[in-house]
Amino acid sequence: MGRALAKYPRESFYLADKFPGYDLANMDKVEEIFEAQLQKCGVKYFDFYLFHNVCEMNIDAYLDEAHGIFAYLKAQRDKGRIRHLGFSAHGSRAVMERFLNAYGKDMEFCQIQLNYLDWDFQDAKGKVELLKAWGIPVWVMEPLRGGKLASLAPADEQKLRALRPDEDVAAWAFRFLQSLPEVKVVLSGMSNLEQLEKNLATFSEDKPLRGEE
């Protein structure tokens, strides 16, 4: 990674990384991990750094000051080695509330799974409302729910095309996100050039959904 990035001026790209909280064995290794990440990337700072995967499994460890995770990462931000500090949430709204009550005033963004299926199914609506109350911008992962929203049952696709004949089915998921002012960043996994070109075409226009849609 470092060799690839070294070809470009540091200010010409954004670089994000995360503390791997999915493994509880990492909780006492924040300094070791962070320094190794910087070294691997060959940079002096990260533009964005996340407390990764805040969920039921690790919330107690994240909140345990004995591990020193928050204190260390906040200190790195104060030194300019992290430009923006945030977190990704994979658990319930209640878990997010616990994390925010402890660290919310220092969080600059939050990444959640958000799409029109999980709006109700995983209470993404409630999570967006919670982040809005804290004034924290929303980053989106799984906008197409692993590709499941890129193609629908024929009858459902027909309903969408009746409303927007020129709109790709997958684009509806992105138009839904464009309807939410809290959303500032959308992360979309793309496996080929065609998908990249379609996403670029979709986001070249701002066409949020109307009420009836």
Walk through the language-model features, giving the residues of each.
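Metal-dependent catalytic neighborhoods of phosphoester/phosphodiester hydrolases
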Residues: 1-3, 27-28, 59
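Acidic (Asp/Glu)-rich catalytic clusters
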Residues: 2-12, 35-44, 77, 99-105, ...
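A short, structured active-site edge motif that brings together acidic residues
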Residues: 11-23, 49-51, 112
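Generic anion/oxyanion-binding catalytic loop in active/binding sites
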Residues: 19, 35-38, 161-162, 185
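Glycine-rich anion/phosphate-binding loops
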Residues: 24-35
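Active-site groove signature of glycoside hydrolases
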Residues: 39-61
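Beta/alpha (TIM)-barrel catalytic core signal, keyed to glycine-rich beta->alpha loops juxtaposed to Asp/Glu
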Residues: 54-213
